[in-house]
Amino acid sequence: MNTFKVQFFSPDDQISFSGVVSLSVTGLEGELMILAHHAPYLIYLLPGMITVKMSNQTEKKVVIDSGVLEVANNNCSIITSQIQVFDRAIHDEKSFKNKRISIYLSYLDEKFLS
């Protein structure tokens, strides 16, 4: 199976996933799915949820603030100011939605009220 590596970077954290089958993100151009051996690409990401599908059939959900995604050499790097990984064992759905909403609201405040 074709897989690739995804790395998230923020000032406070760094998270890596190996064995990724697909990555779903939302950028300025709309929804985008990254697969293994994707052509080199650079895109501005909107705040929101990123879905990481692993080769073992599991999914990871990551909430980010706005950021930049770069794809090169079968690696994907995401640079953002905030990273929050959702884990059902740790978070309940309500607290996760509240965290996601707070990220969206801070983005809207920054963009439209500044």
Swiss-Prot record:
Pfam families xref list: ATP-synt_DE_N (PF02823)
One CC-aspect GO term: plasma membrane
Subcellular location: Cell membrane
Gene3D superfamilies documented for this protein: F0F1 ATP synthase delta/epsilon subunit, N-terminal
SS bond partners: none
InterPro entries reported in the protein's UniProt record: ATP_synth_F1_dsu/esu, ATP_synth_F1_dsu/esu_N, ATPsynth_dsu/esu_N
Membrane topology: Peripheral membrane protein
CDD domains: F1-ATPase_delta (cd12152)
Keywords: ATP synthesis, Cell membrane, CF(1), Hydrogen ion transport, Ion transport, Membrane, Transport
GO molecular function: ATP binding; proton-transporting ATP synthase activity, rotational mechanism
Family, similarity comment: Belongs to the ATPase epsilon chain family.
Assembly and interaction partners: F-type ATPases have 2 components, CF(1) - the catalytic core - and CF(0) - the membrane proton channel. CF(1) has five subunits: alpha(3), beta(3), gamma(1), delta(1), epsilon(1). CF(0) has three main subunits: a, b and c.
Function summary: Produces ATP from ADP in the presence of a proton gradient across the membrane.
Name used for this protein in its record: ATP synthase epsilon chain
Organism: Wolbachia pipientis wMel
Primary gene name: atpC
